Amino acid sequence: MSTAREVFSSVDQGETWEAIGIKSRWPLPYARGLAVKSDNPDVLYAGCGETTTGMNGHVLRTTDYGANWETLKLPVQPNATIWGLSTHPADANRILAFSLFGEVYMSDDAGESWHKIEREFGEIRTAVWLPNL
C-alpha cells in the first residue's frame, strides 16, 4: 500500500501493516504507484517523485519484498513524479511506467532497460494491460 510519504507491507492478508521506511531508502520522498511482477511476488516496482506534481521522478525496484530498493535508469529525466506502473499479466518482463504529466516509459526486460514512448498524453492517472494483447 502506498501513501504520500510511505509504503506499507502486510504479511498476514492485510490484518496488520508495517512501514518499510522509504525516507531512508528512496532517492525522493513522495511515494506513488506500486506494481508487482506477475511471475514473482518478491519483485515490486514503485514510482516516486519530489511532491505530487514534482519536476522529478524515478522508477524503483526491489527483489526482496521491499527490504532494499534500486533506482532504475530511465532514458531521460521524467517531467514529473512517476505516478504509476503497470506490469503485463502474460509477459512478466513487460512494464509501463508513467509520469503524472503524460510521459510513458516501457521496459521489455523487467526494468533493466527502458525506452520512452514517443507519444505523450495529458495527465495519466492509471494504465492497465489486457492479458491477451
Language-model regions: role of each:
Residues 1-133:
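Extracellular glycan-interacting surfaces
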